[in-house]
Design a protein with these regions (language model features):
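Accessible peptide chain termini
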Residues: 1-2, 18
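Terminal domain-initiation and capping elements
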Residues: 9-134
Length: 134
């Protein structure tokens, strides 16, 4: 024993460093935060027609979507309101149709701005958004 400390934690037979464990905890928190944000917006009724809102979450693949579908008079309404994914230790927002966006809510929940990628902007523009570049 040379006095050094082993900072590994054992989960289900796998060894994860403290840094990896912290990242896993962050990702779990981000999943919960994204789920709560989408559930909140999913509970807001559509104003016109017979249109329902759906929250679709693929925890295993880390995809989070808010969709609407239905009828407004004789017109079929269908579309993505929000699509986000947790990948490479960042939240990638592919589409955000919420009026003020969900980024402020993510930041208020403790997600660092450099961990949020506004993927609907071209890669060469992202560095000017104040968020992550991916």
């Amino acid at each position: 024993a040379n006095g050094s400390q082993n900072n590994a934690i054992n989960f289900d037979g796998g060894n994860y460093s403290m840094e990896t464990t912290d990242k896993l905890l962050d990702i779990e928190k981000w999943r919960d935060t994204l789920s709560k944000i989408l559930q909140y917006y999913g509970n807001i009724p559509y104003r016109y027609g017979d249109v329902k809102t759906f929250v679709i979450i693929s925890q295993g693949r880390n995809h989070f979507m808010l969709l609407h579908e239905g009828w407004q008079k004789r017109r079929h309404v269908y579309g993505t309101i929000v699509h986000a994914e947790i990948r490479h230790e960042q939240i990638w927002i592919y589409y955000d149709g919420i009026e003020d966006g969900i980024t402020d809510e993510l930041v208020a929940a403790g997600v660092p701005k450099d961990r949020i990628v506004l993927a609907f902007h071209p890669p060469d523009v992202r560095e000017y958004t104040g968020y992550g570049v991916g």
